Amino acid sequence: MTVRATDRAATVRTMRRPRIKPEHRAYRTVDGNVRIGSVVHGIGAEVLDPDGWVWTLVEAMDGTRGPDDVVAEVTRRHPGLALADEDVTGAMDDLIRAGYVEDAGAPPPAELTAREQERYGRGMTLMRWMDLRPRASSWEPQLLLRRARVLLVGVGGTGGAAARDLVASGVGHLHCVEPDVVELSNLNRQTLFGESDLGRPKLDAALAALRALNADTTLTGERREVRGPGDLEDLLTAAKPRHPDGAPYDLLLLAADRPPEIRRWANRVCLATGTPWAEAGYRGPLVSVGMFAPGRGACWQCLRDAEAERRDLRLAPGQDEDVASPRMPWNPVNAVTAGLSGSLLAHAALTLLCGIPPVEPGCRFGLNLMVPGDPVLQRSERRDDCPACGTRPAVTTPDGEAR
Ligand SMILES: [Zn+2]
């Protein structure tokens, strides 16, 4: 895409005092090139700089000058190059569009108190590091999180850890749904609960623990079991308490695995209501999270069908894939696998709510604890023949269930 010089200048002038983000600090390689954005794969880049003025540019973008003064500083220090102002402005614009620059002159948003800025300051700098989108303020993602309304179904091992991470991070409103009571066998992994909570509804114990963690978050909940897609639809569309602007939840997080069809139901209801959602869990040492947004890439069913084809489990026609990794009546899990699963779910929520990191939904990723360095990653295109989101008519079984 060609960007006009006037547009480039306009982008640059939105910044009062452009500064290379501290986390993206540039350095010069032995070849004289400029490496910027840190050495983290997915963030950093290398810029050729045969004449040395790009290095001067990144040095000048230290948050002490306005854009015009940055251009003047670069041209002043390289008089022999006959640099045009447009060249320098264009390079500055490239750096801004790549996400390496923040506006040191942008005041913190008035909506965030000094106490909140202190509380969430470290998280803001991590978001700033992982963010590759130009923003008016580096606090913008924190505001998005504070305005967010999230529905969490299941507050056990995965859901409890996800709730803990989101509430600590400053999510605005979390509504928790959970029917069970705390049992002794839960305590090896459900770390929101203690021995004094045995026999108590998990919902009450979780809300008490989360309120103690962060009074900034609006915490609500209901003791309820999801028995069908209608229950999920009811939960999603009847936001309680209803937000002043009348909008339902921004996001569904599914951390329940009963009944077994619950993910299929969530997929269907989220497609129908246009709700982004994520689900996480573990199967033995495999821990993963899937994140989905209607209209953006594969849905849960697309991904599941594509993965079944890819894995080629050598199943006979009609044989259910669960025979290859059976579900056990007990739940092999500890605080590590449940905690990782919940943290991945919270991470997916931040991605869907704030766009950080800029990972497109319609994928599943995670860890295989048996083989460090062997990441779990699934991504597929949206499938035309998908029975949930596809455009071709679905094949229907005699009992009316779409397949
Ligand atoms: Zn689909």
Go through each PLM region and give its residues.
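Adenine nucleotide-associated cytosolic modules
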Residues: 1-403
